[in-house]
Amino acid sequence: MKKKKENISKTKKNESNGENNNHFQLPIICNADSLRTLIRKKTVRVVDVRKAEDYQQEHVPTAVSLPFGDLLEKDTPVGIIDILRDLGIVDKMPVVIYDDTFGALAARVAWTFQYVGHTNTALLQMTFSHWKNQGLETEKKINTFPKSQHSLNVNHNIHADASYVENAKEHPDKILVDARERLNFLTEHIPGAKNIPYTMIGSNGNILRNAEEVKRFIENRGISTDSEIITYCGSVGTLSGLAYYALKLAGVKNVKLYSKSFREWKSLGKPKEEFKDANYWDLSAE
């Protein structure tokens, strides 16, 4: 995905359910000012992935509701395309996603949209609570849009399954990254994985640190931005989804998400590694 410094570049025109036709390529992270501008111009679909009852209380203006649990229930390529169509999202339409869970749910949804071919997807730089605490606009209107058409173009290059992960250990240039908290990682993890706790990649109300900070952080872990990196977490790819976008933001070109993560790995009886004699310093993520 082409990244620019909060610079949203115009690409082309297309249909967008009666809204402004100008489509723009979004950066990985969309800040509040940029999103407010896009909302005013009616050139974006905002997606709220919190629980339905939270959305009904209030939300970012024009946002549609996609509770994260609903996405998991339809988590196949065809099912996700149906969701995009139901939300009135067409190919190339700019989509900005937010949550109230430090960006983890939004990241998993954004990655899923990209996996089925909707590449013009960004994460809101902040959570909804932070948006509200800054005094930014909210509304209670339940937003719906006419059902759209959307093509299916699965991007296998950003996904890893258990077999791929298992074979990765034979390739030194492929690095596994466990995004869980340090103690969970030390208790047990996929052999050879490095730990980048999700708690270390956000900062100052933002769901992700800036690109240079993330790059420095991963390099301190002995991870090269030239490597192929596979992220995973404990269950359904939320924490590792956030790590996925942190790595992309830092300039890592080849990142994959093992979306079924450690829960599937254990259920398949795959090998695990642990630190039986971990001490206080082992718990430090720095």
Model-derived features: positions:
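Thiolate-centered catalytic microenvironments shared by cysteine-dependent enzyme domains
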Residues: 2-6, 13-26, 71-163, 224, ...
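Flexible, charged surface loops at secondary-structure boundaries
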Residues: 38-41, 88-89, 168-171
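Short conserved micro-motifs at the rims of enzyme active sites and ligand-binding pockets
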Residues: 205-207, 268-269
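Short, glycine/charged-enriched secondary-structure capping and boundary segments
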Residues: 59-62, 110-112, 137, 189-192, ...
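A short, acidic, amphipathic alpha-helical segment used as a generic capping/interface helix at domain edges
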Residues: 210-223
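N-terminal intrinsically disordered, low-complexity segments enriched in P/E/S/T
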Residues: 22-75, 79, 94, 174-185, ...
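Short, well-ordered coil/turn elements that cap or connect secondary structure elements
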Residues: 41, 60, 118, 171, ...
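Active-site neighborhoods of enzymes that stabilize oxyanions during catalysis
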Residues: 18-31, 128-187, 194, 269-286
